[in-house]
Each structure stands twice: as C-alpha cells, then as structure tokens.
From Swiss-Prot:
UniProt domain Tyr recombinase: residue ranges: 116-305
GO annotation, cellular component aspect: cytoplasm
Annotated function: Site-specific tyrosine recombinase, which acts by catalyzing the cutting and rejoining of the recombining DNA molecules.
Record's compositionally biased regions (Basic and acidic residues): 350-362
Protein's gene: xerC
Species of origin: Pseudomonas aeruginosa
Region Disordered, residue ranges: 323-384, 401-427
Catalytic residues (UniProt): 156, 183, 256, 259, 283, 292
Nucleotide-binding recorded as keyword: no
Gene3D superfamilies to which the protein is assigned, alphabetical: 1.10.150.130, Intergrase catalytic core
Low complexity compositional bias, start-end: 402-413
Protein name: Putative tyrosine recombinase XerC
Length: 427
C-alpha cells in the first residue's frame, strides 16, 4: 500500500471538512516529494522520517510547517496501524518527530493601516460608481463588505465562505455560523454592529436582485460580476484580494490577522472580558484565546511606572549632579532671580539683597559643592556652568599659591639672601 492510498482511506473513514482533507493530502504530497512517487509504506520508517526532517529544515522549511506534516501523517499512520492496514510494523514512524517552534508575536494589524485600507477600498467603490470602469478589485462594494465583516466579527475565512443567505437574521441583527463549517464544530452567532449594517444591507439587496435562494452561498463574488466564471467563491479569491490590499497599503493583511487584532483590541478595552472574547472567536479554551492577544506595551509601561512611583524609585533618578560636566539633557532648576553672567554687573535698581553667607570648608575656604548640599539635605543653590568653571579655576589658583608659599621657607632656611630674592620674584 502507498502513502497516498493510506491517506485516502483515512479521509474516507472520517467526516472531515474540505479544508482539513486538503491539509492531509498536502502533507502526503510533501512526503512523496521526498521519498519518491513510487514509495511504499515499508519505505517510511522512523530513521527515514528523521532524515527527511533534517533535510527540509536545512532547506528553510519552518518548524511550524514541519510539525503540520508530522502531526497529520502521524494521525494517518496511527489509523492504519490500529485497523491493520499496515502489518509490517506496529511502530508509528512519525512518533516523536515534531520540533519546538519559536514563539512568534501575535500577528495584528495596526489601526492606522486598517484605516488606510478602508479608505482605499472606499475610493475604489466611488471610482466604479462614477466612471463605470472596472476597479482593480471588482466589484469594489463587495470586497469592502467582505473586509468589514472580517474587521467587525473576526470570523474565520471558511466561516465566511459557508454563510448562506438564510444565516443572516436581520430582525435580531445576528449572523449564524453553523457548527459543520467551524474548526471547533461548535455553532455560534456574531452580532451585526452599526458599522456593518450598511454593507450587509447592500449585499442582501444585491443578492435579492441576483435571485439568491435561501441556501445559496451569500459571499459569492462570482454571482455579482460577469468577470468571474466559477460557481462558488473559494479561499483563493479572498486571499488574492488581500494580497492586492497588502501591496497597496504596505502592511500584511489576512482574515486571520484580523482575528488576532480583534482579540487584542477587546482585551485592551477598559471593560476587557476574556470570556466574551473567547465566545466571539469561538475558541475551545481560554489558552487559545490568550495566544491570540498581543501584549499591550503602553499599559505595561504605565504599570511599571506606577510601581516605581509607589516604591519611591524615581526620587533618586530625578536628582542631577551639576558638579561634573553638563549633559545636553540635564537642565538646571528654574530660580526666581536669574544670576548675572561673569563680567555683567546689574544696574543699581536691579541688584538684589546680599544672600546669607554660606558654609566654607576649612582646607580651602571654598564653599562646598552640590554633593555636600545633597548629603545634608539642604536645597541646592542655583548654579550655572560658567560660574562652576570660574570657581574651579579660582580654587586651583589659590591651592597652587598656598602650596608654593609653604615650600619657600624650607628652601630659604639654608640660603637667606637667595630665599628673599625668590620670595620677591614669586610676589
């Protein structure tokens, strides 16, 4: 028996959605590409599968894609072993062949990009209406409606393709998503919001004009334009529209990214409700919903800032030491009366009262710097860079002069006349 025959046997024995059967066949096709079209199930053993894995990963296949192949083929072989379709071995060759993929950030679409995409689609609608010419995506009104349904509801692509005309409950403003069309096999409804009403209203009106029956596929572009020949709309047509939209806007957009974006936006809202988000996306568990949500870094920054305020961490961060060279970002605190620069003497009427004398050090007689003021919890006096430089030069000059004066008596103790001459010259 060949791997392809095994796959068809598995699909025949299970009630699979078309999309699921497509994935099983794609995994089998990838296997035959490596092992050859004439390969049999006996050729596929555990070591051969590991060799295939190494080869395709080295060629650039993503780990997630490999895991998709491995998981689906393991399911097929498990079914074959259980039902004795494979008798040469009871060991599943795909057991423990998955790899750990990197955790990627949630794929969301920025609000600004969504606005640009909506604006471009609206322009296409207006251009078609005014000129009668075919837009780049036609009919533009239909694709704008499709875009808005994904934006407002976050439903899966397959769910949109399976919506029938009868699934729109206009009286209660609800859309029914049938369980047989869903990945989770659960039936649910999504509300029709105010922003979606005009788009769905036109879609239903056009469907009435085209003679749609209640069980007909509602989102079927082929029945709204003579430029399409297919009887039903498929995922390729929707994905082709989103590729054009991505090219125009410059930001990757897909229906599934709109699901991630909706989940993230709902959890950013003040009335965030994880259960509501889970139900709207029709997930089986909370963990899946949480994996859809992108981290809110603005909220994270605010929480971290509140923590630092509560623990007094910013009190030390905000202190600036002006004793060193000034930084471009460091600015002195404003004072009530600006100080005059060196060489500038304020006029008599502008002069202020002399300030209280400041404490001086015993060694040099120079007032203490900012470090001493901070250590004693005394408010720092206003300071400028020019004054700091002047005080530093004066301190160095006085220190050098004092050191020279103390060295002169030692030099003159052995030669009185020469010492007097030296003092005269230093003076």
């Amino acid at each position: 028996m060949t791997p392809q025959q095994l796959t068809e046997e598995y699909i025949f024995a299970h009630d699979l959605r078309e999309a699921s059967a497509k994935i099983y066949r794609a995994a089998t096709k990838a296997l035959l590409k490596h092992f050859g079209p004439t390969a049999t199930v006996q050729d596929v053993d555990h070591r051969a599968v590991l060799g295939w894995r190494r080869k395709v990963l080295e060629q650039g296949l993503s780990k997630r894609s490999w895991n998709t192949y491995s998981n689906h083929l393991r399911t097929i072989w498990g079914y074959a072993i259980e039902h004795e379709l494979v008798t040469h071995s009871q060991v599943n060759p795909f057991r423990k062949t998955t790899v750990i993929p990197p955790r990627r950030a949630s794929k969301t679409v920025a609000a600004e990009a969504i606005l640009r995409a909506r604006s471009w689609l609206s322009m296409q609608v207006g251009a078609e209406r005014c000129t009668g010419d075919r837009a780049r995506i036609t009919p533009a009104w239909f694709w704008l409606c499709t875009f808005e349904v994904f934006y407002y509801t976050g439903i899966r692509l397959n769910a949109l393709l399976c919506i029938r005309k009868r699934d729109i409950d206009w009286d209660n403003q609800l859309i029914l998503i049938r369980g047989e069309t869903e990945k989770t096999h659960k039936e649910f409804v999504v509300p029709i919001t105010e922003g979606l009403v005009p788009h769905l209203s036109r879609l239903l009106q056009e469907a009435e004009k085209a003679g749609f029956a209640d069980d007909d596929q509602l989102f079927n572009v082929n029945r709204f334009s003579p430029h399409y020949k297919s009887k039903t709309m498929n995922s390729d047509q929707v994905e082709a529209m989103y590729r054009k939209l991505t090219e125009k806007v410059g930001v990757r957009m897909t229906p599934h990214r709109f699901r991630h974006t909706l989940a993230t936006d709902l959890m950013k809202a003040p009335e965030r409700n994880i259960h509501l988000t889970k139900c709207l996306l029709n997930h089986s568990n909370i963990q899946t919903t949480m994996s859809y949500i992108e981290a809110d870094y603005d909220h994270m920054r605010a929480v971290l800032h509140a923590r630092s305020l509560a623990q007094g961490a910013l009190e030390n961060v905000r202190k600036v030491d002006y004793s060193g060279s000034p930084q471009a970002s460091a600015k002195p605190k404003p004072c009530g009366q600006p100080l005059a620069r060196v060489g500038e003497v304020p006029p008599p009427e502008a002069r202020t009262e002399p300030s209280e004398p400041r404490e001086h050090t015993q060694e040099t007689g120079i007032q203490r710097g900012p470090t001493s003021w901070e250590a004693e919890a005394v408010p720092q006096p206003p300071d400028t860079f020019e004054q700091s430089v002047l005080f530093t030069l004066m301190a160095q000059h006085l220190s050098n002069r004092a050191a020279t004066a103390s060295a002169v008596p030692a030099a003159t103790s052995g030669s009185g006349g020469r010492g007097s001459a030296a003092r005269d010259s230093l003076a």
